[in-house]
């Protein structure tokens, strides 16, 4: 059997493949980790970018950044991006792309979102809101983003979008509740190629986003920052 629904099929010779943990240690069949490949058709590195090459290609092995596992039947399953993993305080890992795509896909009030958890007490979300749609919704209630009452209404609306996936919500059970965001930050600008927060394929560059908003991420793990009506959220909706 060369293929099975949901898999990428079997390895094509002479390509070599292994699954590794965050320390580069090879994992046994069935365990999920980073997909690492080697072979004559695998790229040798990045053009005129030795730093990225050193991070990605080691001893001829290409660390793809993809998350997956090999089944006992020798079938490869790709499950997301390895470097985007949420990591809970007890070390459990989860790929956030499905949640992020669902939030953006079902909500007209969320343009972009990135989830974050790096061995932290809870998961947080960085949200780029769709201010135009929020303003249209608010207009029916004679509210605007020009005053605090209106901004609090918009923040509450964003919270309701996140809560649709929690217990009692429209999409309850779609994702494990422990990985859903407990709080969120409203960002002042979108992720773009110009600010290098998305790449040419329109994928988020998580490292850049985390670096740019490191202070804000830390703030969300404080008692003040965990409150959705914190001053930073109110200011970023102006």
Identify the residue ranges that each predicted region occupies:
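Active-site loops of AMP-binding adenylate-forming
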Residues: 1-6, 21-22, 49-52, 131
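Short Gly/Pro-enriched turn/cap motifs at secondary-structure boundaries
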Residues: 2, 6-11, 26, 57-59
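Hydrophobic beta-strand positions
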Residues: 18-19, 69, 197
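Conserved ATP-binding/catalytic segment of the ANL
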Residues: 25-30, 34-88, 229-236
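AMP-binding/adenylate-forming catalytic core of the ANL superfamily
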Residues: 39, 44-45, 67-175, 179, ...
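Conserved C-terminal "lid"/linker of ANL adenylate-forming enzymes
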Residues: 112-114, 121, 165-238
């Amino acid at each position: 059997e060369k293929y099975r629904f949901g898999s990428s099929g079997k390895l094509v010779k002479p390509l070599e493949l292994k699954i590794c943990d965050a320390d580069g240690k090879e994992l046994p069949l069935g365990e999920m980790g980073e997909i690492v490949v080697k072979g004559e058709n695998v790229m040798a590195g990045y053009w005129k970018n030795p730093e990225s090459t050193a991070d990605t290609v080691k001893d001829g092995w290409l660390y793809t950044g993809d998350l997956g596992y090999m089944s006992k039947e020798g079938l490869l399953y790709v499950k997301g991006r390895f470097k985007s993993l949420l990591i809970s305080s007890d070390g459990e890992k989860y790929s956030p792309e499905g949640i992020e795509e669902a939030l953006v896909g079902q909500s007209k009030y969320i343009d972009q979102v990135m989830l974050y958890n790096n061995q932290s007490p809870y998961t947080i979300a960085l949200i780029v809101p769709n201010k135009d749609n929020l303003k249209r919704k608010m207009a029916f209630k004679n509210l605007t983003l020009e005053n605090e009452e209106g901004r609090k209404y918009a923040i509450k609306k964003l919270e309701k979008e996140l809560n649709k996936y929690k217990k009692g919500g429209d999409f309850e059970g779609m994702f494990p509740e422990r990985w859903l965001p407990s709080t969120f930050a409203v960002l002042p600008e979108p992720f773009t190629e110009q600010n290098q927060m998305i790449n040419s394929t329109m994928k988020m560059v998580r490292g850049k986003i985390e670096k740019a908003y490191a202070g804000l991420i830390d703030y969300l793990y404080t008692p003040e920052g965990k409150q959705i009506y914190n001053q930073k959220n109110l200011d970023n909706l102006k």
